[in-house]
Amino acid sequence: MVRVRADLQCFNPRDYQVELLDKATKKNTIVQLGTGSGKTFIAVLLLKEYGVQLFAPLDQGGKRAFFVVEKVNLVEQQAIHIEVHTSFKVGQVHGQTSSGLWDSKEQCDQFMKRHHVVVITAQCLLDLIRHAYLKIEDMCVLIFDECHHALGSQHPYRSIMVDYKLLKKDKPVPRVLGLTASLIKAKVAPEKLMEQLKKLESAMDSVIETASDLVSLSKYGAKPYEVVIICKDFEIGCLGIPNFDTVIEIFDETVAFVNTTTEFHPDLDLDPRRPIKDSLKTTRAVFRQLGPWAAWRTAQVWEKELGKIIKSQVLPDKTLRFLNMAKTSMITIKRLLEPEMKKIKSIEALRPYVPQRVIRLFEILETFNPEFQKERMKLEKAEHLSAIIFVDQRYIAYSLLLMMRHIKSWEPKFKFVNPDYVVGASGRNLASSDSQGLHKRQTEVLRRFHRNEINCLIATSVLEEGVDVKQCNLVIKFDRPLDMRSYVQSKGRARRAGSRYVITVEEKDTAACDSDLKDFQQIEKILLSRHRTVNNPIEDDSDRFEEFDVDSQMEPYVVEKTGATLKMSTAIALINRYCSKLPSDIFTRLVPHNQIIPIEENGVTKYCAELLLPINSPIKHAIVLKNPMPNKKTAQMAVALEACRQLHLEGELDDNLLPKGRESIAKLLEHIDEEPDEYAPGIAAKVGSSKRKQLYDKKIARALNESFVEADKECFIYAFELERFREAELTLNPKRRKFEDPFNYEYCFGFLSAKEIPKIPPFPVFLRQGNMKVRLIVAPKKTTVTAAQLQEIQLFHNYLFTQVLQMCKTGNLEFDGTSNAPLNTLIVPLNKRKDDMSYTINMKYVSEVVANMENMPRIPKDEVRRQYKFNAEDYKDAIVMPWYRNLEQPVFYYVAEILPEWRPSSKFPDTHFETFNEYFIKKYKLEIYDQNQSLLDVDFTSTRLNLLQPRIQNQPRRSRTVSNSSTSNIPQASASDSKESNTSVPHSSQRQILVPELMDIHPISATLWNVIAALPSIFYRVNQLLLTDELRETILVKAFGKEKTKLDDNVEWNSLAYATEYEEKQTIIVKKIQQLRDLNQKSIEDQERETRENDKIDDGEELFNIGVWDPEEAVRIGVEISSRDDRMDGEDQDTVGLTQGLHDGNISDEDDELPFVMHDYTARLTSNRNGIGAWSGSESIVPSGWGDWDGPEPDNSPMPFQILGGPGGLNVQALMADVGRVFDPSTASSSLSQTVQESTVSPPKQLTKEEEQFKKLQNDLLKQAKERLEALEMSEDMEKPRRLEDTVNLEDYGDDQENQEDENTPTNFPKTIDEEIEELSIGARKKQEIDDNAAKTDVLERENCEVLPVAINEKSRSFSFEKESKAINGRLIRQRSEEYVSHIDSDIGLGVSPCLLLTALTTSNAADGMSLERFETIGDSFLKFATTDYLYHTLLDQHEGKLSFARSKEVSNCNLYRLGKKLGIPQLIVANKFDAHDSWLPPCYIPTCDFKAPNTDDAEEKDNEIERILDGQVIEEKPENKTGWDIGGDVSKSTTDGIETITFPKQARVGNDDISPLPYNLLTQQHISDKSIADAVEALIGVHLLTLGPNPTLKVMNWMGLKVIQKDQKSDVPSPLLRFIDTPTNPNASLNFLNNLWQQFQFTQLEEKIGYRFKERAYLVQAFTHASYINNRVTGCYQRLEFLGDAVLDYMITRYLFEDSRQYSPGVLTDLRSALVNNTIFASLAVKFEFQKHFIAMCPGLYHMIEKFVKLCSERNFDTNFNAEMYMVTTEEEIDEGQEEDIEVPKAMGDIFESVAGAIYLDSGRNLDTTWQVIFHMMRGTIELCCANPPRSPIRELMEFEQSKVRFSKMERILESGKVRVTVEVVNNMRFTGMGRNYRIAKATAAKRALKYLHQIEQQRRQSPSLTTV
């Protein structure tokens, strides 16, 4: 027989508030909840549930709701609350209203017509009813606040309810909800209580519901074994403590003195008495309660604390004297107790000095010692201790911990106890930093308790209240429970089966304790008997089902494949587990919803059950039990078993019958995550990351590889036609040389090819003569060459590369004239004819060069020289070589100018030599014979072979190119002395003068030489463009099935063009956020003028501006913090949100380290309450999350001053900063967007004179100083619970004269669960009928969707961009005649231009003129969008968790890398800078060694593993062998307390990440990271999208292997309306229900706001339905739509930014995108358009959070300040430490904004145009604002702010939660931490915190530089 544990047999309970709401809709209910906002939550949601009746017009069955309050001041408060959360019009009525309501019934009717809900005082309502202005039957809901007043016989509540009951017999009456605080007083006799509850129920005609957190604890918590231990009284006076009287006397006298002193004037002095009183009070209390030993220890701690306060401040003398007095008292007490106490070193020695309660406590703990359990208790398996000890006061908790730690160190038998303590903050100021510090510490301690690192927790009541703690097996209430709440809460902590709940009580309190406990237990029974969870019974009324075998009732479910078996008895637990694994936010606990249906069979009642799973589960329909069961419990189990069966068939449970939850997904994601930690140094590289690099072969274009020319066979001649499009920059031509355009030369270079070569676009190269456009032109006629000619050509070709270009100096290349060379074309000089552009090979020239090539330079014989006659013609356009110098490495010069006035006899510029003649004789022993020759002014031939970018200007030249001015006629051979000249001689005067007679003239002319220098760059580019052309053809054939891929003869590609330095100045490419900010300052006319000028760039050529992100040094904003460092040294600056007084919280036995977390006075005296002290180090870092000002600003005061304390007393700088902020009207945000509402707060009046300001300032200072000292309150002795329970004593409200009618009223309290089930279902049915009548049925179907005028009137932005996006300046030129070709989708022309493909394959590492980054951004966004669209439409019943997982897998870098590698993309990628000498293989050359490095061994294996993971196979976990290689050498890694810490090394100055670990062959291989391949795939998507449009791009993505919807695939979108509730009798049930929801939540109103009318209204309802709203079974929740909408918004916004006329560089684009596409922005917009009023949810936590957020947004006027911390750029919501639950922005609000976008997209038939119109209407202001005042990434900003002084020093991964904490160090001594889901987010958070602090310091400095002292 199976006995089932009670907690496994019931479904997880719903939130008690939801439970209450459910009852309140179905029957009249009185709800009793504490003062929190729990009550209002239920009231507002009840009103929403009745929305259908309330919104219907009164003449069509509509009704009204009344919220009745006691006092006038509550009317407005409740009305505002209802208005924030609903779209009801709320009227307010009380005695003072002058609404004319009383004048006539017509007036009253008009008022009722205008308002749906009326908040009214009781008396007014009664009067209106009595005067027949209102009828009770016209109301649908009647809510009474503080309904216990109905017990008073004369109270209006009572009178209204009397009328109500009279009507009830024959008219429909409204639903009544009574709200009251707790009715259970701490000290009320149970019998009395019962009687009073019945009276109230009768008066209100309602049932009191007792569901609350307390009752759910009692009901669902395990029942522990309760024990009371009676101990001897502790009489401290009788212990014979030496010096006892003296000690007591010191206490009394000091306290008396402090209390009676009149020294401190309340308005003028800093009063230190609070901390002094606390120190005395706590020490004395410890002395009285725990004895002298504990008091001795406490006195030591206080002595230290007071000492700190004394040291910490510059305090007035009087204050100091007082503090010193207190410190002396502590020292005296310590000294008096020390002699005896110091001796104690064992528990026995301690025994006489402590109460028996403490000794008993240790005896109980000892029973958990494993050895004790084995030996004395004879237990086989030891039970591990997991205990909580509750005490009332914080300092008792602290002293008890000290005692435990010492006893543990004295007594080995207590070694197994690992204690710690948690206390709550004092409850006064929860925002203060010390409570945040405490909160953080509390989180940490509880986490360690969860993981059993701590097994004994000493706690104050903070833990009694809802802080989630794991189940314990021992709870000790050290101080007896004094009220019901304390009893139930503490008992509820003992949740483990067989746990013990122990109360220790002294003899004197025994009687009181006994009677209290009896009462508590009685009351608990009463409450439980009244709290029926009808559909989820724990005990069954009918019979105890444990008597028989449950599992025999129904066959177990068995999975054939694995043999996994599920029995009936365990099914419920599995359903609970499954629900908890569904995706939901932190506020929502998803639980199943079940209903029990009694059925009569042959006079016997049996039970059926139906189960509804949460609405985001794929199973949306109700799971119904076919065969009834004998009792309710078995019915529940059976329906759960059926549900599990269906879940398994749906694939929601795996074959082992376990939920496929987040864990398994997370495991898989680990392999493919977007490498969150990839930038963290020292973490092993994953597949797809930027860290993992591999080697790939470089590819040569097919056309160039197959172009080998054979003798006597026809071949093509290709000419390189150079045409200058811009003169050389003046900076690059300082001597103002004149250059001719190569286009006008009569000769040029080309090459021979056996095969025809495809057309490629022209491209630029940057020569000495200027910027050239290179065209590859084929000669009209083919040619043949003979074998002899071919040999000569090969020699010429070899000569160019070896001698002229010096390519073979390193000996790594050899010439290969056969077809073996990878690139085998031959270079030839060509003659060209201008008229018909025909080209012929200039063989004469070839022969001439070949004849002279061996012996250059030729040294002439002496007699030849004597004959030498100078002929100027020979030297024009010549290259000369001095033959008298180093012949091994000849130097070549261009002859720039012939100087006729210079002769060899001219004066030599250097003082050492008279003339040139003398110089040559002395230096070279050479005599110059021709004395009449002119000298030559020459320039160096450039050795720069990378001409793809213009030469960098203004850099000091290398030593060999500049001559020393003293010998400016001779080129320097030695570099040593030329260096000084660089700086002293202006460029233009540096001339190099040579003597013609001593030169040899090279056969190659200067102009051709120039072109030869360009050949490596030209060939390199031609090869690239041919490769990308091959890719274009492949895509046309394979993706589009095209046959024609060649360009027609009359068509050519547009030129490759990219912004170079000069052009960037001419056009707007926004590279830096700062630049954008500056640009925005310029007037718009300026911009327009500039744009007009840009359009006129010469040659009519449009420039293609892909922002080349130029990492030039960012300007540092100097913040020199070091000047103040001495002030900060006092404390450890580990600024992580803890205040200075709280140390690290790891208490050890050394007293020095004890953190006495009573209160941190130090911080309080240094800093203000809600401002930021300039130097209060850690205090400043506390994240408030919302700009500067915490509290609401005082209404009337124009000066929200804060008092800022600093180490020198008051911080006047900051004060002045504040004054500035208030008085300077210019700081008010200029209203940039017209949509922002005007501020409702009027600006402060200008104050007259500065003196007045100062007067006021002084008064304020004093006043606030006083307030601050008052706020230094230490917590009370008894720590108050955070949530004070208000209780109502019903006796106070009853009258003596009982009204007669009460006697006759039957009690409303149902007798059995069955009766209650019946009552509830009748209530629900009635409401439904009235709803259906009230709902208008004429809006069932709509024909079309439409965009409303409000959205069209926006400067309508269509989302269809021209096919060739302006952002890429369309690249396909057709012949000029054909201006524009229409862009219908089928017309993809010839695909994407090779230029664009090349850009998409060029990484930023290549330092080329273009890079893929911009395209990658848009491609990434489109990829996410297309994948999301596909998944949404194919995985129709998967919830958002699975969709997100599938998307992550698809768009992960790891998957893109894998696909890219399969397509051969790596061989096409340009990943490194072009270096002609080292890494380029010239035509007809092969490497001398054929070495080829392999990839690392495991690369292949890792790739295969990822392949399997992405295909969804299960991966065996391999044990990782730690080799020490997977982590960088300098990184230290350690794991302690479940936190893995990686400390990053200090970065060395030089570090090159790109260096391959192994040598490889640079000529044939390149080293590329996996991420670069993924990026290139995204960029290719981007460039196709921009050129061809979305549909063709989807085809390309499909070819790549990505899963996307094809245009021609018709994706059937099923209707969003789910029809599970339709029945044959009511075929339109679901439509009617949808209709009701539509009315109830007023979606027509919402449509007007957003400017779009839905055709399929179910989409909109779904978009607003939260997972917690179980009632909506007709559309499901918004999670899937949110998943879709997120991607739609991301793509649309990214595309919009991309197309902006200010071409944003990739970095700016990414920053703007992150700033606009994030939860905070979306949530703010949702609130701006009042989405929360239509939000369909039942989730208390979320409800309160939304309320806070709405308030915050309205205070800000819905102004999106992107630089406020809340809007700072981060990719996802990051988490502040210890505040996971405190994320200020309710994610659900952002989610519904996204789901609305998804809904519009689907409803409009997946039309982005329509969607963008509506979204742009809503977002326009925000987008424009963001571009006008762009935010920047916090990490980037921090690096620029403190460039050299920022270091991210360590990363900690909290193993349990997987969260990451990162520490950043700024200026060496300030540390900030950030926390997040992964390294990237955590790093951003840390940077944010650091920035926040630095900005504050900077601001204070800037605003008050002159103020340094008060």
Curated annotation (Swiss-Prot):
Start and end residues of each PAZ domain: 845-1003
Keyword Hydrolase in record: yes
Coiled-coil region(s): 1245-1280
Stored InterPro entries: Dicer_dimer_sf, Dicer_dimerisation_dom, DICER_DSRM, Dicer_PBD, Dicer_platform, dsRBD_dom, Helicase/UvrB_N, Helicase_ATP-bd
Domain of life: Eukaryota
GO CC terms of this entry: cytoplasm; cytosol; nucleus; RISC-loading complex
Pfam families: Dicer_dimer, Dicer_dsRBD, Dicer_PBD, Dicer_platform, Helicase_C, PAZ, ResIII, Ribonuclease_3
Domain Helicase ATP-binding: 20-201
Listed EC numbers: 3.1.26.-, 3.1.21.-
Gene3D superfamilies tied to this protein: 3.30.160.20, Dicer dimerisation domain, P-loop containing nucleotide triphosphate hydrolases, paz domain, Ribonuclease III domain
Acidic residues compositional bias, start-end: 1288-1304
Site positions (Cleavage): D1537, G1538
Effect on the protein of changing G492R: In mg375; defective avoidance behavior in response to P.aeruginosa
Binding site for Mg(2+): E1682, D1791, E1794
Site (Important for activity): K1787
Effect of a null allele: RNAi-mediated knockdown in a cps-6 mutant background reduces the number of DNA breaks in embryonic cells undergoing apoptosis.
Essential cofactor(s): Mg(2+); Mn(2+)
Keywords: Apoptosis, ATP-binding, Coiled coil, Endonuclease, Helicase, Hydrolase, Magnesium, Manganese, Metal-binding, Nuclease, Nucleotide-binding, Repeat, RNA-binding, RNA-mediated gene silencing
SUPFAM superfamilies from the UniProt entry: dsRNA-binding domain-like, P-loop containing nucleoside triphosphate hydrolases, PAZ domain, RNase III domain-like
CDD domains attached to this UniProt entry: DEXHc_dicer, Dicer_PBD, DSRM_DICER, PAZ_dicer_like, RIBOc, SF2_C_dicer
Function text: Component of the ERI/DICER complex which is involved in processing amplified double-stranded RNA (dsRNA) intermediates during small-RNA-mediated gene-silencing or RNA interference (RNAi). Involved in cleaving dsRNA in the RNAi pathway. It produces 21 to 23 bp dsRNAs (siRNAs) which target the selective destruction of homologous RNAs. Seems to process the precursor of the small temporal RNA let-7 which is involved in developmental timing. Required for avoidance behavior induced by small RNAs derived from pathogenic bacteria such as P.aeruginosa.
Protein name stated in the entry: Endoribonuclease dcr-1
Species per Swiss-Prot/TrEMBL record: Caenorhabditis elegans
Gene: dcr-1
